[in-house]
């Protein structure tokens, strides 16, 4: 990931956008969602084409329109990639899509 793109990632996620990326031969998506009970969240999902995807990590959001910076911080700092966080692996990540930034 290039310098400055982390700011684009934050901006997109705070605006209910999503980020798709590849890391170590696997694809992932970070995106907002809503549970069956109406609770909003920001989650990291696997993004496989040939098998069922699963939620790697999910953090609840309490705003109706946007995602709190604190929630984005928690998601990006959670050590769910072989003991490392998204921010720790950022230099080895290939961003494939960012939706929601300017």
Segments the model singles out, each with a brief description of its role:
Residues 1-23:
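Negatively charged, low-complexity tracts enriched in Asp/Glu with abundant Ser/Thr
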Residues 2-5, 67-71, 85, 89:
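Generic short amphipathic/hydrophobic targeting helices enriched at N-termini
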Residues 16-19, 78, 96:
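Surface-exposed polar/charged interaction patches
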Residues 23, 32-34:
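Generic secondary-structure microfeatures
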Residues 28-29:
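Short, isolated positions in well-ordered beta-strands
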Residues 34-82:
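Acidic, aromatic-enriched beta-alpha/helix-loop junctions
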Residues 83-102:
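Low-complexity intrinsically disordered segments
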């Amino acid at each position: 990931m290039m310098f400055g793109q982390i700011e684009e990632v934050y901006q997109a996620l705070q605006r209910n956008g999503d980020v798709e990326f590849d890391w170590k031969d696997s694809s992932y998506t970070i995106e907002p969602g809503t549970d069956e009970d109406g609770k909003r969240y920001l989650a990291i999902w696997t993004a496989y084409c040939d098998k069922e995807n699963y939620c790697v990590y999910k953090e609840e959001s309490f705003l109706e329109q946007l995602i709190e910076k604190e929630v984005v911080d928690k998601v990006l700092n959670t050590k769910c990639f072989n003991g490392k966080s998204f921010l720790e692996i950022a230099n080895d990540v290939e961003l494939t899509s960012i939706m929601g930034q300017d």
